Amino acid sequence: MSTSTEKRSKENLPWVEKYRPETLDEVYGQNEVITTVRKFVDEGKLPHLLFYGPPGTGKTSTIVALAREIYGKNYSNMVLELNASDDRGIDVVRNQIKDFASTRQIFSKGFKLIILDEADAMTNAAQNALRRVIERYTKNTRFCVLANYAHKLTPALLSRCTRFRFQPLPQEAIERRIANVLVHEKLKLSPNAEKALIELSNGDMRRVLNVLQSCKATLDNPDEDEISDDVIYECCGAPRPSDLKAVLKSILEDDWGTAHYTLNKVRSAKGLALIDLIEGIVKILEDYELQNEETRVHLLTKLADIEYSISKGGNDQIQGSAVIGAIKASFENETVKANV
């Protein structure tokens, strides 16, 4: 493939792949994990690994970059990548994993590596089968298990891996990656837009890149136009702080009918999901100064129950009324010191 063709091919990639770190030095925000894993490799004592933590924190990028440093051009022969959320049953363990782990490369020294992404989606039977395969083929194969939630993995599987928790990326790491992308894509991002993007990402770099790519697609002239915070909120489908405050102010100060009208008006005008409004309102309520902390406890518990009902398919109109009722009831005898 020619250089120009490769360049065009890379330009057409989703940004989460286009800007995926190729070396461990390019992985941001997980310095302790990188240092420890590198030490394992340098000493020739790489154990089975478990990387767990929220999405978009660099779990897959770290192990793939590590594997490329270890194997170089022989990567495709020595590494098997599987996504357990696609093949979550016992057959994938018995067939693909076992077949790969049981064979040796004639002209290659060292161990093979099996990367099992989203392993917390595997059934318990598949995890138990995987544990037996790990035990049997440890001599020539290493496993790296990736998961969002470690508690969804069986204790037997957990005990056979050295665990590393990937924290949500710190603001500094996200800012560095955003700056890098803006330079390469020749984009302009307002300070308020960058602040909104970092806040909405919750430490998820994958979401940052997806939102930036969506924002670029909305611009008439990407080389000249600046991405505003309104564009960020629009592409995220997230409520703006001003909308959240307007809804909360109406609930606290207006009668039931007006509050219900305001809530529905904001939702329909901005195309917002009720669950996003609840999450935004909770963040605002966390900063309120209350005379009685029991008010906060009672209200957050009620909102959590409503959020759970929505996740189980509850009617949005009914749950929207429940939100108004929960907030009004909780603040009925409470003096709010903070202004909306």
Curated annotation (Swiss-Prot):
InterPro entries: AAA+_ATPase (IPR003593), ATPase_AAA_core (IPR003959), DNA_pol3_clamp-load_cplx_C (IPR008921), DNA_Rep/Repair_Clamp_Loader (IPR050238), P-loop_NTPase (IPR027417), Rep_factorC_C (IPR013748). Replication factor C (RFC) is a heteropentamer of subunits RFC1, RFC2, RFC3, RFC4 and RFC5 and forms a complex with POL30/PCNA in the presence of ATP. Component of the RAD24-RFC complex which consists of RAD14, RFC2, RFC3, RFC4 and RFC5 and associates with the checkpoint clamp DDC1:MEC3:RAD17 complex. Component of the ELG1-RFC complex which consists of ELG1, RFC2, RFC3, RFC4 and RFC5. Component of the CTF18-RFC complex, which consists of CTF18, CTF8, DCC1, RFC2, RFC3, RFC4 and RFC5. RFC3 interacts with ECO1 and POL30/PCNA. Pfam families: AAA, AAA_lid_RFC1, Rep_fac_C. Present with 3140 molecules/cell in log phase SD medium. This is Replication factor C subunit 3. CDD domains: AAA, HLD_clamp. It comes from the Eukaryota. Its main location: nucleus. The modification N-acetylserine is found at S2. ATP binds at residues 16-20, 28, 53-61, 148, 206. Signal peptide: none annotated. SMART domains: AAA.
